């Protein structure tokens, strides 16, 4: 881990010498692995959205096009210029995450006020806030030069990183909030926070989760309405502990997800042959349960290929982090990698009953134009760290 908090450029002539001139602005292996995932995502989205009028493949494709353009622009931008804007990132986070509560533009959907509508344009600010959460976490931790042993400073950092989580929970959006926590966790780990502080934080959070789950019915009965947990959140936790619970709701969703994966066999049923989604048995097929559609069509073998691509991508990402010219660059890349790791484990894990059901999407695979654009912005930030390594 780097022991410096400021940029210490390497000789640009030496750096450029090891990069082919045609590709000096693009890390080809890294971007090819991401492109392979995007292509697989478009293939499965074409199938998943074909039979569902609520989703548009064209909109998903437009997200990819916009994302590619932004990725190219961001790759050319020197990420070092962002290192001193901690307060700005925090303010942007708060504004984005509270925007859905504003009258006229705020939109409620599926029990959460998470959307903003500006004329014909509708998007989730919480998705775009992932970018500023990454930059906020990286800029905060970079100030400590790779070592954070002072408890008071550690608590100060926790307080800053908790603000986006608190804001997103006012919507409420637990899934996105968990993603923010994963970003913060990887920033603390990669930034050299004392391991005793980290263990203590995990213990406190675990205790709070148990306390909330146990006390929720008491508070609900006293108040006459949901206080700590929404009904669907409690149901998902109970289904995770007992898959036979709520067989007509979240328990049904899990059962159909596992049927879809199991029915794919080793080589799958084939493209456009995912009957669980096409016949309407699998809920939210293009979004939460897109892995089930993919596994049903391409089988266990296809799932192994998908996981292998994720592993290759993450290995290349961590290599970029290891060779970054400064701690800020390392932290940006590690935060993004941590976010993707959490999303992959949670999304696939919930499909096979190993994790609670949430609305956390699968990187480059799940439906959502905003989601795709944000992932491409993340690719651009990582590529910028590689391009400007020593510049």
Please report, for each region that a protein language model flagged, where it lies by residue.
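Membrane-helix boundary/helix-loop-helix interface segments in multi-pass membrane proteins
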Residues: 2-32, 36-37, 43-171, 348-363, ...
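Hydrophobic, glycine- and aromatic-enriched re-entrant/interface helices and adjoining loop segments
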Residues: 109, 113-115, 200-300, 327
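Interfacial segments of multi-pass membrane proteins
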Residues: 141, 178, 183-197, 275-302, ...
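Transmembrane alpha-helix boundary/anchor motif
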Residues: 69, 77, 136, 210, ...
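Hydrophobic alpha-helical transmembrane segments
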Residues: 62-70, 297-314
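Hydrophobic alpha-helical transmembrane segments of multipass integral membrane proteins
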Residues: 35-42, 91-101, 181, 207-208, ...
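Loop-to-helix entry and N-terminal half of a specific, functionally important transmembrane alpha helix
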Residues: 319-358
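Hydrophobic alpha-helical segments of polytopic membrane proteins
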Residues: 65-69, 87-88, 94, 154-167, ...
